[in-house]
Amino acid sequence: MNTLQNAISISGIMWTVAEDKDKKPYLVNTQMTCLNYIAFDFETSGLPKKRQVSKVTRENLSNFDTCRAVSLSAARFSSRGRLIKTFDALIQPLDFEVSQSSTTIHGISHEKAMSEGRPFPDVFRDFMEFIGPRTKTLIGHNVIFDLNCLQSEMLRHGLPIEQLDDFVFRCTMEMYRERFMSPIKLHLTL
């Protein structure tokens, strides 16, 4: 039996912290109980040249030359926060190098990505199949970084970024800030 605790609003969506039979906490989306969502994350060859870029375009694509996709991982969760399925793919660095400093962070060497990876368009196609037609919510930590990485690779490979227009992107970093770092909320809890 689940015991409900602590209803919170994160990015305008109501969530409740619940516990499963083993007393492990998980989030329940109380507004959209039929929703399942996907958390995704890229590992990259580095960071963008300019950190303040809010959206990638053809005009500023060169800002992302130092931030190329090396791997893409994702996990599908139910509305009750239960893991349903995972997706992991290495991406071949066909026209860039994976630096040693990047390898130190994520453990993916240039050689490994070349030998075990696949071209980005193939990985993207499989990722879209993994998402499926019913899921519309994608979640990431600092999601603007992952979204820019995704869109920059799509632009480089001639894939229309408009196919992402129907998705809602949620940022766990922003959710955390809203819940725990807001001075107004901190003041109200004192």
Predicted regions and their residues:
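A solvent-exposed, charged loop/short amphipathic helix patch at secondary-structure junctions
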Residues: V56-R58
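Walker B beta-strand of ABC/ABC-like P-loop ATPase nucleotide-binding domains
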Residues: A39
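A short acidic, glycine-rich active-site loop
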Residues: L61-D65, K112-M114
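Metal-dependent phosphoesterase core characteristic of DEDDh/y 3'-5' exonuclease domains
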Residues: S11, W15-V17, V28-T30, C34-N36, ...
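Metal-dependent phosphoesterase signature
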Residues: T104-D126
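Extended, intrinsically disordered, low-complexity regulatory regions
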Residues: M1-K23, V28, E116
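Short acidic, Gly/Ser-rich segments with clustered Asp/Glu that frequently serve as metal-coordination loops
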Residues: F42-R51, N60-S62
